[in-house]
Amino acid sequence: MDEFHRYGKEDSSWQQCFLYPLFFQEDLYAISHDHYLDGSSSSEPMEHFSFNDQLSFLTVKRLIGRIREQNHSIGLFVNCDPNPLVDRNKSSYFESVLEGLTLVLEVPFSTRSKYSVQGIKEWKSFRSIHSIFPFLEEKFPHSNYILDTRIPYSIHPEFLVRTFRRWIQDAPSLHPLRSVLYEYRNSPENLQRSIIVAPRVNTRFFLFLWNHYAYECESILVPLLKRSFQSRSSSHGSFPERTLFDRKIKHIIRISHRNSLKSIWFLKDPKIHYVRYGERSIIAIKGTHLLVKKCRYYLPIFRQCYFHLWSEPYRVCSHQLSKNCSSFPGYSLGVRMKPLLVRTKMPGELFITDLITDEFYPIVPIVSIIGLLAREKFCDISGRPISKLAWTSLTDDDILDRFDRIWRNFFHYYSGSFGRDGLYRIKYILSLSCAKTLACKHKSTIRVVRKELGPELFKKSFSKEREFDSPAFSSKAVARSQRERIWHSDIPQINPLANSWQKIQDLKIKNLFDQ
């Protein structure tokens, strides 16, 4: 497989023309089996897989023979496995095909993504959770509306096959993909014309399908929106007056051509800011209410015409930039004005000008977090800490580690938000709930637990400065962290609050449209 990767880097056409023979190699399924074992031991467990611990090469040989005999009238999994077809999620055949198919298609897809990102310099796609933080730090000098969109889950399997066919020259390699998709669509639990792909489906194959599907959606839509908004008008920068405006703009752009090409991009404002994580994306644009309303109607029509998808109206919402405009993802986002002092020195005179720019103001949604902690039995609905009775059978170290892990995840995720009062309240709830859990386990009081286990117990687990124990962080860095916003880049996955809170918000919006 390493040799296949090496040849693919040298010649991308080689990997597109010779993918189908890989399905007849027994080593492919051994590699896919190892990939499954590695994925099951990672931080994102694959709950839907039940792959056998020992790989049966007899099963692999039967599978390869079935692929050779495959045609349009014969299913890939019919009468091939001793397990019933209804329990296909536990079938070793089905899991082997999913893992092997994903492993083969990931190689040209990764190469295509790398070349496309290098080729398109005017647009950088944001597809990682770490891209949320630069977006929250970004300034919005001219944007006045936000489009909150959600990519539809349901998609016809033939469309996925055709999108792969655009950039894979080896057409026979897509036959197993078509068989897998149609077998999944025709299953008893999924009898419908389309299949469901979503980022929350915790399998390697469907996560790969979702990433490819979302990549196709945004790689076409976002550059189209950028060109549309750039062609409307040029930004007037920070000129305080409008006298002879067109002449000044032409003069500056002509000078920029002679001096530096980068100055053109400084003057021309793209008027659009885009970020996506999972199925939800935010687009900050500049325009009138009528223009934003047209965009709301354009996005569903665009998906319907190009991707053959029907999107519910509530999946595209618009908000005006205001104090509390949106929530993404797990943050309560507001917009505040940030003044910038500019000094302009001219011969004999000095001008001082205040420029006002808008920036996001993310705060901790303490009410929603308390509701989440109440559902998990850490506190009641009013935020009063209670003992976690389900953990009383664990050891003291396990209880402390679990509470510490929860607090560390909250601290990492919301460390860059404005206002730490919400974080301190979460820390108080978790620390007191931990103390009550230990007291309930030992059948004593909180005071006795503190006295027996020592005063350093909770200080070690819930220390505020424990994130800066590394020698790379000096005392000045710790002091600066109390004043400035610091985003932690070691977040393994999105906070569970984001998904639970977003479900509530989607339900509220859907109810408004149904009324």
From Swiss-Prot:
Record key words, sorted: Chloroplast, mRNA processing, Plastid, RNA-binding, tRNA processing
Record-level GO cellular component terms: chloroplast
One function term, GO molecular function aspect: RNA binding
Disulfide bonds: none
Cellular localization per UniProt: Plastid, Chloroplast
GO BP annotations listed: mRNA processing; RNA splicing; tRNA processing
InterPro entries to which the protein is assigned, alphabetical: Domain_X, Maturase_MatK, Maturase_MatK_N
Pfam families: Intron_maturas2, MatK_N
PANTHER family tied to this protein: MATURASE K
Family per record: Belongs to the intron maturase 2 family. MatK subfamily.
Job description of the protein: Usually encoded in the trnK tRNA gene intron. Probably assists in splicing its own and other chloroplast group II introns.
Protein name: Maturase K
Origin species: Cedrus atlantica (Atlas cedar)
